[in-house]
Swiss-Prot record:
Pfam families: Phospholip_A2_1 (PF00068). This is Neutral phospholipase A2 homolog taipoxin beta chain 2. The lineage of its organism: Eukaryota, Metazoa, Chordata, Craniata, Vertebrata. It comes from Oxyuranus scutellatus scutellatus. It is found in: Secreted. Expressed by the venom gland. CDD domains: PLA2c. Disulfide bonds join 11-71, 27-117, 29-45, 44-98, 51-91, 60-84, 78-89. GO terms for biological process: arachidonate secretion; lipid catabolic process; phospholipid metabolic process. InterPro entries: PLipase_A2 (IPR001211), PLipase_A2_Asp_AS (IPR033112), PLipase_A2_dom (IPR016090), PLipase_A2_dom_sf (IPR036444), PLipase_A2_His_AS (IPR033113). One of its GO terms (molecular function) is calcium ion binding. Keywords: Disulfide bond, Secreted. The keyword Secreted applies. Its main location: secreted.
């Protein structure tokens, strides 16, 4: 679910910044999800949105699905059992790893999505 995803992000980025900093970033990190990603970090969120859309096509509810995972020194690990839990955890894990690898540009936080994300 989205709360677990937030914790997974913080684990992946080793708490360098709060997960909430990603909630209104660019065109895809948050609630908008349209237009052209503003950078590679935003592209991570676009891929995550697409992953969630695929999960929904398989009858899952990614924003609400809880799963088992661990924050480890070498990275996050999914330990879920059901198909939806495994799928959603994999979406979140891939996105958290992607976000951890990309640079965060404060200029892309809380942008005017009506103008920039068409």
């Amino acid at each position: 679910n989205l709360v677990q995803f937030g914790f997974m992000i913080e684990c992946a980025i080793r708490n360098r910044r709060p997960a909430l900093d990603f909630m209104n970033y660019g065109c895809y990190c948050g609630t908008v999800g349209r237009g052209t990603p503003v950078d590679d970090l935003d592209r991570c969120c676009q891929v995550h949105d697409e992953c969630y859309a695929t999960a929904e096509k398989h009858g899952c509810y990614p924003s609400l699905t809880t799963y088992q995972w661990e924050c480890r020194q070498v990275g996050n690990e999914c330990n879920s059992k059901t198909q939806c839990e495994v799928f959603v955890c994999a979406c979140d894990l891939a996105a958290a790893k992607c976000l951890a690898q990309e640079d965060y540009n404060p200029a892309h936080f809380n942008i005017n999505t009506g103008e920039r994300c068409k």
